[in-house]
Amino acid sequence: MWNYLSLLPVILFLWAIAGIWIVFAIAVVNGSVDLNEGFPFISICGSYAPQSCIFGQVLNIGAALTVWICIVRHHQLRDWGVKTWQNQLILWSGILCALGTSIVGNFQDKNQKPTHLAGAFLAFILGNLYFWLQFFLSWWVKGLPQPGPHWIKSLRLSLCSLSTILIVAMIVLHALHMRSASAICEWVVAMLLFMLFGFFAVDFSILRGCTLHLHPRLDSSLPQAPSGSPNIQMAQVL
């Protein structure tokens, strides 16, 4: 049964893809990029006003959704008995991917190129690593639940492999000054990563919801709650 948590990956997928293609369309229409000179990188499309404002907002909201998804996934893996160090490694690679996405949106290529490239490294490289770690985890941990149809695992492997190949191709082609080919690889990698995040909808479909637990500090100087008072240690996250 689908729930609001399973909608998060779908919302991220639709939001990110629609957002960056809208930015591309605006850049082409207002002449910020010229397709006759070659296919542009995503960052070039988002470097000039007014689409730079939209670009930053799209990536900031996308980064926030990514962090939310990574945290939900972290707790899901924890409840499945995944070791803490493995789960923490996966979580932080996802959070750093989200941080890189936000950096890319806020530090445009034409204004702060070194910072922008650092953000792109986090977004693409660690984003790809995040999904490889998720995939390898399904092999490391025996008996780990595999929600969804059996072909999902094979599809994720294919998408991760293609993403890795295209990242390498993107870097090599850029070094060879084949910018249009490199830019096309970048766009495809971005679409693949959005798709991989979107597939978390399958994993989250078995969840009913999530709760936030508040643990009060143990201090004898604090007044004790009166008998019969409402339990304030758990609040439902809406």
From Swiss-Prot:
Known glycosylation sites: N30
Function summary: Modulator of macroautophagy that causes accumulation of autophagosomes under basal conditions and enhances autophagic flux. Represses cell death and promotes long-term clonogenic survival of cells grown in the absence of glucose in a macroautophagy-independent manner. May have some role in extracellular matrix engulfment or growth factor receptor recycling, both of which can modulate cell survival.
TM segment ranges: 9-29, 52-72, 87-107, 117-137, 157-177, 187-207
Similarity field: Belongs to the DRAM/TMEM150 family.
Gene expressing this chain: Tmem150b
Organism (species): Mus musculus (Mouse)
Keywords: Autophagy, Cell membrane, Cytoplasmic vesicle, Endosome, Glycoprotein, Membrane, Transmembrane, Transmembrane helix
Record keyword Flavoprotein present: no
Name the record gives this protein: Modulator of macroautophagy TMEM150B
Pfam families referenced in this protein's UniProt entry, alphabetically: Frag1
Membrane keyword on record: yes
